[in-house]
Regions:
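Interfacial transmembrane-helix boundary/kink motif in multi-pass membrane proteins
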Residues: 1-19, 45-49, 70-102, 161, ...
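Hydrophobic alpha-helical transmembrane segments
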Residues: 7-15, 52, 86-91, 133-137, ...
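Hydrophobic core of alpha-helical transmembrane segments in multi-pass integral membrane proteins
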Residues: 14-22, 55-65, 93-103, 235-254
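Alpha-helical transmembrane segments in multi-pass membrane proteins
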Residues: 15-69
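Functionally important transmembrane alpha-helices
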Residues: 18, 22-30, 173, 178, ...
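Juxtamembrane helix-loop-helix connectors linking adjacent transmembrane helices
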Residues: 37-46, 73-143
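Membrane-interface capping segments at transmembrane-helix boundaries
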Residues: 67-74, 248-262
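Membrane-interface helix/loop boundary segments of multi-pass membrane proteins
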Residues: 146-171, 198-205
Length: 262
């Protein structure tokens, strides 16, 4: 009976995120347009403030749910926040972004995926109406927090209750990828989910997967706003980070094996 409950949690949590986020978007839009009578053009220009508010509510809601679900696990061993693991998490995020860049370059050459790449690029450009501050607050800060609480803190942890760690990481990462609703984005989001899931499984500290996500989205944002000369340097940097990212992940896996054998 307990396993059935944990089996339902990932599905219900993802559905709740989908429904709540869409409901909040609808309510904010109606409040601004119908109650405050702000002109649509002005609303669109500053709509990122509404999105930031929505993400703040989502973070509060899902962090509360996360705490309620796992309040009995509060005493479990976890890695305290430290400079070495913070830096390692950022390196993993940068390296995943490097792999993502290679994947996108390949996808651009495949006729069957070109429309998906175009849709993904258009969606990225439309975040916060193209406003740099809004994009940073939404895509770089807020989205990593709420999505990691949801997919690592709730979905992955629930799956640990009825499936092996490797299967839980893989399935939760695929769900994370599919949730992006774009085949090109889903592929590298799944890869990022696996890396973030490994760090969370070994460290039991949500900050580390959040930092992986943060680093990945930060690079994506910088590439969208930086001039071409700077973009070339960013591309070289994230490609160089692939090897160190692999090292950090392998080290985490080895540390986990040593801990299990003790």
């Amino acid at each position: 009976m307990m396993k059935k409950r944990y089996f339902a949690i990932p599905i219900l949590a993802i559905a709740l995120h989908f429904l709540l986020s869409n409901l909040l978007y609808f309510l904010v839009e109606r409040l601004v347009l119908d109650v405050f009578h702000i002109p649509p053009q002005q609303f669109m220009k500053h709509s990122y403030w509404g999105e930031i508010l929505i993400y703040a509510v989502l973070i509060l809601a899902f962090f509360t749910l996360y705490k309620l679900l796992w309040r009995k696990d509060i005493s479990e061993p976890r890695t305290a926040t430290n400079f070495k693991d913070v830096l390692g998490s950022l390196v993993v995020g940068f390296g995943i972004c490097g792999i993502s860049g290679l994947w996108i370059m390949l996808a651009e050459q495949l006729p069957s995926l070109q429309k998906s790449v175009e849709a993904m690029n258009a969606g990225t450009e439309n975040i916060a109406g193209g406003n740099a501050f809004g994009t940073f607050m939404i895509a770089v800060i807020a989205a990593p927090i709420v999505e990691e609480i949801l997919f690592r803190g709730i979905v992955l942890r629930s799956m640990w209750k009825f499936a092996p760690a490797w299967a839980s990481i893989l399935i939760s990462s695929v769900l994370f990828g599919v949730y992006h609703l774009n085949i090109v984005q889903a592929a590298y989001a799944t890869l990022m989910g696996i890396a973030a899931g490994i760090l969370y499984e070994k460290k039991r500290n949500l900050l580390f997967p959040i930092l992986v996500h943060f680093a990945n989205n930060l690079i994506t944002m910088l590439q969208g706003f930086a001039p071409s000369e700077v973009n070339e340097l960013i591309s070289i940097f994230i490609l160089i980070m692939i090897a160190p990212a692999g090292y950090v992940i392998c080290r985490s896996l080895r540390q986990g094996k040593r801990a299990d054998s003790m």
